[in-house]
Amino acid sequence: MTKTLTQHLETIKREGKGIFLPYIMAGDHEKGLAGLPETIAFLENLGVSAIEIGLPFSDPVADGPVIEEAGLRSLGHHTSAKSLIASLQKLDTQLPLIIMTYFNPIFQYGLKDFIKDLARTPVKGLIIPDLPYEHRDFILPLLEDSDIALVPLVSLTTGLERQQELIKEAEGFIYAVAINGVTGKSGSYRNDLDQHLSKLHDIAEIPVLTGFGVSTLEDVDRFNQVSDGVIVGSKIVKALHEKDASIAAFIQEAAAYKK
């Protein structure tokens, strides 16, 4: 059975639109998790395709400074897997949500219980950046009877054979990592990045979204040429924290991108 997230993003792709996913950190709001519905409604009204939500962890190996600091603020508001899931279970949204977190919080929660409880929310995708491909069977069997897709990350250093292995039977979308490093590190793209993304796009059977370091409308345009859309995190997290109202215009324009 094709997962809802895959179908939703494929529909946007068929309509000739670029897919736009904003990333936010759960609990990084002056109201803590109580502010999450407000942030999701704000993004939904701007026309985003889906929303990626970070669940904070104290040792976030893939996060750059902006998202790491947001995670610390969120932990300061006592955000946990249990409190986030409880909040999401009450949420009313038409958009599919994607949780990005590390394996440890899921393990501490209990793998079966985490997936079972997450399945009662609007979450349709799960990204675990520190879960090696070889260990994906810790999670995949638990997702078989759910409508939650495990989203694979593919880095620039991944060879073609390995790429094909990573994306085989993948659901949701392929998360193409645009830089070798952590999130938010913009302006340091490799010369062969576009070629790398084009090749990945050619072999993928589901949408390919480019993330890590994407921060300008020029980036949005560039990566929509060689993939199906973009994920923007650090820029949005920083703007929301600083109450920078100009972020709304950026999100709206990026979300309205036409191929």
From Swiss-Prot:
UniProt xrefs under SUPFAM superfamilies: Ribulose-phoshate binding barrel
A Pfam entry, by short name: Trp_syntA
Gene3D superfamilies referenced in this protein's UniProt entry, alphabetically: Aldolase class I (3.20.20.70)
GO molecular function: tryptophan synthase activity
Keywords: Amino-acid biosynthesis, Aromatic amino acid biosynthesis, Lyase, Tryptophan biosynthesis
One of the record's GO cellular component terms: cytosol
Residues at the catalytic site: 52 (proton acceptor), 63 (proton acceptor)
Pathway: Amino-acid biosynthesis; L-tryptophan biosynthesis; L-tryptophan from chorismate: step 5/5
Catalyzed reactions: (1S,2R)-1-C-(indol-3-yl)glycerol 3-phosphate + L-serine = D-glyceraldehyde 3-phosphate + L-tryptophan + H2O
Entries under InterPro entries matching the protein: Aldolase_TIM, RibuloseP-bd_barrel, Trp_synthase_alpha_AS, Trp_synthase_suA
E.C. number: 4.2.1.20
PROSITE patterns: TRP_SYNTHASE_ALPHA
Enzyme class: lyase
Protein family (similarity comment): Belongs to the TrpA family.
Function: The alpha subunit is responsible for the aldol cleavage of indoleglycerol phosphate to indole and glyceraldehyde 3-phosphate.
Assembly, per entry: Tetramer of two alpha and two beta chains.
NCBIfam families assigned to the protein according to its UniProt record, in alphabetical order: trpA
Protein name according to UniProt: Tryptophan synthase alpha chain
Organism: Streptococcus sanguinis (strain SK36)
